[in-house]
Amino acid sequence: MAPLNTIESPRSPVKRILVLSYSQTGQLAQIVQSIVAPLQQSSDCAVHIETLQPVAPYPFPWRFFSFLDAFPESAHLVAPPLHPLSLTGDEDFDLVIVPYQVWFLAPSLPITAFLQHPTARKLLAGKPVVTVIACRNMWMLAQDKMKGLLTACGARLLDNVALVDPSPTMTTLFTTPLWLLSGKRDFLPGLPAAGVDAASIQAASRFGCALRDALHHDQERGSAPLLTGLKAADSDPSLLFSEKAATRSFYLWGKLLRAVGGPGQLRRRPFLFLYVVFLITLILTIVPLSLLVQTLLRPLLQRKFAALKQKFDAPSGSGIERMSVYEQ
């Protein structure tokens, strides 16, 4: 467990926390509420939730071509305009919580839009940030992109929480898109419901409790993570090859599609359909093949996987040594 990060100095009587909010399916909002509830219930904390609203809203359930049409801009971090924020940038927050969904192995476009907004640079400069991810199971390269966006704002990333769908990878390749396109988590009978499970959402309150306690001791002013020992981020390096292949695919095809036309333009559709064929082929061949090869080579790759896991678990880690302190 990381050492306490308390700095001896006069405390402000109330800690101000900024929480960004954009949840297309509603599940990320549930996770955020679970985390934020202990902070809202504390008399020592004042929580401001800033709901992000794209000028052109993203539907849920997503229509098929609208879903595909989001990937070129997602892959290239080309964000849409947002409705005006309620913040001016002159506000002073002690901690910023940035929850986000993973869209096409990148942060969701509304969150990207906020982080590229001039107001975000004013708000986040020098501020400690906790990121919270809710996704299928591939988030490592999206978090790398998030780190770049936060660095551009001058923010200090203290912690990362990643909550994922517990179902097998090949199962979620079907259940997650069907959820997004149908609006039903259990669209296919006999398969597990898509998304983060209810128990994990409820248990996420431990992060809010730990943040509350850390804020009480001014630990956010230092550089050490606040959520160690709480199994905040348990990465799976065996998925990294698939993430890299898909990220490169999204980027290259996204570049082509952006050259063909802008978001929503009909002339993109033939190329989007062509990409679907390519993507399905990729999913049915490269993904299972890479998982099989890595399983066979796991004894030879143990050291490499251990190093990758340590890298992507950071800064909060996957240890469980403090879990008993915050069990509900």
Please report, for each region that a protein language model flagged, where it lies by residue.
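Short, glycine-/small-residue-rich phosphate/pyrophosphate-handling segment
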Residues: P128-M170
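N-terminal beta1-alpha1-beta2 submodule of the flavodoxin-like/Rossmannoid cofactor-binding fold
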Residues: A2-P99, L105-P110, Q116, L211-Q328
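Internal, well-ordered alpha/beta segment that forms a basic, Gly-enriched binding/recognition surface
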Residues: P84, V102, N137, L141
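Glycine-rich phosphate/pyrophosphate-binding loop and the adjoining helix
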Residues: P168-A246
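Short aromatic-enriched loop/helix-cap "lid" or pocket-rim segments at secondary-structure transitions
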Residues: P59-F64, Q143-D144, T169-T175
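Short, conserved loop/helix-junction motifs that constitute active-site signature segments
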Residues: A120-G126
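Glycine-rich, phosphate-binding/catalytic loops in enzymes
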Residues: T112-Q116, M146-L149
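A polyampholytic, Gly/Pro-enriched intrinsically disordered region
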Residues: F71-E73, L149-R156, T176-L188
